[in-house]
Amino acid sequence: MDIVSAIVPLIEMTIAGAIINASVHFIPVGGAPAAMATSTGVGTGTTQLAAGAGFTGLMGAAVMASNVGLSPIGMALIMISGAVSSMIMLGVTMLIGQLIYVFGVGVVPAADKCEIDPITKDPQKPYVTPGTTGHGVPTVCFVSGLIGAALGGIGGALAYIALRKLGLDPGVAGMLAVGFFFINAVLASYNIGGTIEGFHDPKFKKMPNGVIASTVASLLFGIISVLMVL
């Protein structure tokens, strides 16, 4: 493979990294406090939740790629498959968590970072238990999580497409794509610095810095990947 043929996959990987980093900022993560229903979001770490959705999307994209190839239409189908797979995984995760919060713990889903849910227009503050920063997965957080999952699936699928275009075997491309996703998810996690409720959270404004960091890291990852196949 010559340098010219490697430029397009390099650009695709750089864009994919930026998309993945942005996607993580949409996902409602409450960390350890959420596991005790004292913080809004799903009770796990930012990287783990984002990576789980991304890996599911990556598997969906890989299965689709094996059937449709890497034509322009095929690439679109691969990215759609990645997005839908990620959305299903994260949607089910948030739903099961919600059922446990509501019927197990007995708390009302309420967001701490907004007075009124931007989607349902329901008031939030009256339902936040004193001493907590919200609990459960309110509608705005659920929708934000689905958006983040879709973006993460698209980013992971695009990275897989780029690696396949470099001539790597599906298995090798899949392993590298997993590592690639973790790199960008961790960068986003450091940028967030703890928990985040979704696109309505003030921490969401930090996203541009994370995207810039992931763009640089993804470009470096892409250059190394290209050098591997030259």
From Swiss-Prot:
Broad class of enzyme this protein falls into: translocase
Pfam families for this protein: MtrD
Coiled coil stretches, renumbered: none
A GO MF term: tetrahydromethanopterin S-methyltransferase activity
Pathway: One-carbon metabolism; methanogenesis from CO(2); methyl-coenzyme M from 5,10-methylene-5,6,7,8-tetrahydromethanopterin: step 2/2
Swiss-Prot/TrEMBL GO biological process terms: methanogenesis, from carbon dioxide; methylation; one-carbon metabolic process
Membrane-spanning intervals of the chain: 7-27, 60-80, 88-108, 142-162, 168-188, 210-230
Enzyme Commission no: 7.2.1.4
Family as reported in the entry's similarity comment: Belongs to the MtrD family.
UniProt subunit comment: The complex is composed of 8 subunits; MtrA, MtrB, MtrC, MtrD, MtrE, MtrF, MtrG and MtrH.
Record-given protein name: Tetrahydromethanopterin S-methyltransferase subunit D
Organism: Methanocaldococcus jannaschii (strain ATCC 43067 / DSM 2661 / JAL-1 / JCM 10045 / NBRC 100440) (Methanococcus jannaschii)
